[in-house]
């Protein structure tokens, strides 16, 4: 197989290198193209079909070389619809892989897999481009120090902390606050870490992608008046796109994130929604290319494809890419090859609970189901670890007692169990938090809570010092001092009512 240089050879203009082939066969999004002898393109090269269809309408289709078939023929996968293409049409080899715009000019904009803006705001003002196929950072470039990525969200930082440069799986159904949590993380990384975010919508519903964009504009994550001050770049490959586009859109988003890490030396947050759709698109392409399917009909190269994406998401000595990936689990089967392969790469899981959302506790992160490999005494320290374990024990005991309370009532519990329930209910409410991006809906100012403040707050609840305060004082507050202030205000209000 011919390897692909990511840039043109020195001293030779790209125009001189371009070779022209002709379409031989079209099967859906797969094109077979014949090139002159000695002019075959490299694997992963971008090919462009520019022509006019029978209605004299302009055709502009970009493809990516996937296989060299022999007899001067290559097989390529189209990145857009192939309607209007005919056998015999000219195909130009660009001589390089797909390259996309990178840098500060991408912030606040929406792109497709080819790096073309699709938000009707005109061309992107940047000359810098990166190829989407790049090697993972070398071992000597990696930052091996284990460090916590502070999000300012109490429940995450205390019970399932994120690793700087790690990968987090976000599990949640519709309507439990996934989008708001994503937007808050984008907002917090910009304010606390001076970082930026890249959102990759892989196989998303177009409606959801549009809703996310509108909500980001409403909450200020995307600044309409001054687009350069936006904190996020969006890359969409929706459900209606051909499988080639859905398979590569994750790499386009990752490439934009790599520029911020390697060139701007920033901490970057990369969202991929949904990582399952990346695997699904790869499976479709694999079948179209005639490969023999593997377990459950997935592509035989599943682990390799997943690894080539995930290994590029890491911390280097320059900066970090921390990735949050929404994971769809088909038929709730965790042993399915797609989620099973994803789990092997994750450092933490954040599980959103419909039960907590129905109680009005936001963020609705399940404190018992969410896990993290970072929650170890040698990484987070003994104080953090012990506080987190005691919080989990208290909540677990409350969960066990709920059936008894439902049948017999709270009065039938022992004094010790009643105290546990009271503290658990305070903890549950203190895990809620007002978000900056939700200010426009709730009217409550958002709060960023540092890790030390979070630990101090839960220690005070567990020690019993705050047993006299009412439960509602802990609901939707930032640090523990706000809870104490809220308790005084509630007491004064109740006196006035009397």
UniProtKB/Swiss-Prot annotation:
Q: Which reaction does it catalyse?
A: ATP + H2O + 4 H(+)(in) = ADP + phosphate + 5 H(+)(out)
Q: What is its EC number?
A: 7.1.2.2
In Pfam terms, one family for this protein is: ATP-synt_ab_N
SMART domains, A to Z: AAA (SM00382)
Looking at the UniProt entry, the stretches that span the membrane are none
GO terms under biological process: proton motive force-driven mitochondrial ATP synthesis
Question: Predominant location of this chain?
Answer: plastid
Sorted alphabetically, which keywords does the UniProt record give? ATP synthesis, ATP-binding, CF(1), Chloroplast, Hydrogen ion transport, Ion transport, Membrane, Nucleotide-binding, Plastid, Thylakoid, Translocase, Transport
GO molecular function terms attached to this record: ATP binding; ATP hydrolysis activity; proton-transporting ATP synthase activity, rotational mechanism
What's in the GO CC field?
chloroplast thylakoid membrane; mitochondrion; proton-transporting ATP synthase complex
| Stored SUPFAM superfamilies | C-terminal domain of alpha and beta subunits of F1 ATP synthase, N-terminal domain of alpha and beta subunits of F1 ATP synthase, P-loop containing nucleoside triphosphate hydrolases
Q: Which PROSITE patterns match?
A: ATPASE_ALPHA_BETA (PS00152)
> Which positions does UniProt annotate for ATP binding?
172-179
**Enzyme superclass (EC):** translocase
Report the subcellular localization: Plastid, Chloroplast thylakoid membrane
Protein topology in the membrane: Peripheral membrane protein
Q: What does this protein do?
A: Produces ATP from ADP in the presence of a proton gradient across the membrane. The catalytic sites are hosted primarily by the beta subunits.
Family under the similarity heading:
Belongs to the ATPase alpha/beta chains family.
Which PANTHER family would you find in this protein's record? ATP SYNTHASE, ATP SYNTHASE SUBUNIT BETA, MITOCHONDRIAL
Query: Which NCBIfam families has this protein been placed in?
Result: atpD
Q: Quaternary state and partners of this protein?
A: F-type ATPases have 2 components, CF(1) - the catalytic core - and CF(0) - the membrane proton channel. CF(1) has five subunits: alpha(3), beta(3), gamma(1), delta(1), epsilon(1). CF(0) has four main subunits: a(1), b(1), b'(1) and c(9-12).
Name of the protein described by the UniProt record? ATP synthase subunit beta, chloroplastic
Organism encoding this protein: Zea mays (Maize)
């Amino acid at each position: 197989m011919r390897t692909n240089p990511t840039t043109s050879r020195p001293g030779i203009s790209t125009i001189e290198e371009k070779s022209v082939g002709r379409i031989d066969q079209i099967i859906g999004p797969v094109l077979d193209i014949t090139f002159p002898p000695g002019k075959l393109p490299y694997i992963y090269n971008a090919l462009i079909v520019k022509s006019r269809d029978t209605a004299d309408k302009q055709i502009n289709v970009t493809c990516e070389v996937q296989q060299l078939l022999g007899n001067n023929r290559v097989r390529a996968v189209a990145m857009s619809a192939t309607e209007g293409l005919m056998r015999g049409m000219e195909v130009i080899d660009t001589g390089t892989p797909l390259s996309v715009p990178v840098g500060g000019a991408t912030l606040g904009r929406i792109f497709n897999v080819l790096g073309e803006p699709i938000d009707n705001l005109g061309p992107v003002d940047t000359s810098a481009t990166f190829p989407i196929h790049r090697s993972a950072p070398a071992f000597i470039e990696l930052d091996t120090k284990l460090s916590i990525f502070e999000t300012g969200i109490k429940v995450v930082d205390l019970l399932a902390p994120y690793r700087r440069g790690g990968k987090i799986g976000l599990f949640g159904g519709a309507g439990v606050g996934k989008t708001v949590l994503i937007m808050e993380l984008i907002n917090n990384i910009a304010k606390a870490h001076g970082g930026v975010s890249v959102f990759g919508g892989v196989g998303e519903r177009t409606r959801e992608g549009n809703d996310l964009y509108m909500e980001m504009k409403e909450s200020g994550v995307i600044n309409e008046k001054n687009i350069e001050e936006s904190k996020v770049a969006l890359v969409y490959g929706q459900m209606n796109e051909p499988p080639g586009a859905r398979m590569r859109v994750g790499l386009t988003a990752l490439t934009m994130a790599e520029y911020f890490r390697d060139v701007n030396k920033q901490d970057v947050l990369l969202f991929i929604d949904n990582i399952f759709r990346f695997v699904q698109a790869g499976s479709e392409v694999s079948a179209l290319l005639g490969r023999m399917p593997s377990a459950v009909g997935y592509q035989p190269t599943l682990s390799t494809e997943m690894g080539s994406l995930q290994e590029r998401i890491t911390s280097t000595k320059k900066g970090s890419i921390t990735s949050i990936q929404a994971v769809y689990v088909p038929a709730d089967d965790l042993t399915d090859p797609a989620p099973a392969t994803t789990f092997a790469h994750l450092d933490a899981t954040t599980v959103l609970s419909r039960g907590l959302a129905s109680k009005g506790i936001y963020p609705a992160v399940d404190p018992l189901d969410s896990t993290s490999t970072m929650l170890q005494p040698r990484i987070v320290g003994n104080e953090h670890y012990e506080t987190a374990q005691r919080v989990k024990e208290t909540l677990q005991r409350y969960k066990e007692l709920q059936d008894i309370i439902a049948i017999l009532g709270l009065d039938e519990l022992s004094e010790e169990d009643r105290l546990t329930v009271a503290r658990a209910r305070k903890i549950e409410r203190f895990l809620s938090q007002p978000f900056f991006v939700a200010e426009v809906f709730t009217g409550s100012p958002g709060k960023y809570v540092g890790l030390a403040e979070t630990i101090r707050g839960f220690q005070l609840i567990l020690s019993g010092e705050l047993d006299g305060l009412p439960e509602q004082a802990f609901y939707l507050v930032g640090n523990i001092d706000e809870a104490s202030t809220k308790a005084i205000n509630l007491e004064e209000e109740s006196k006035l009512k009397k």
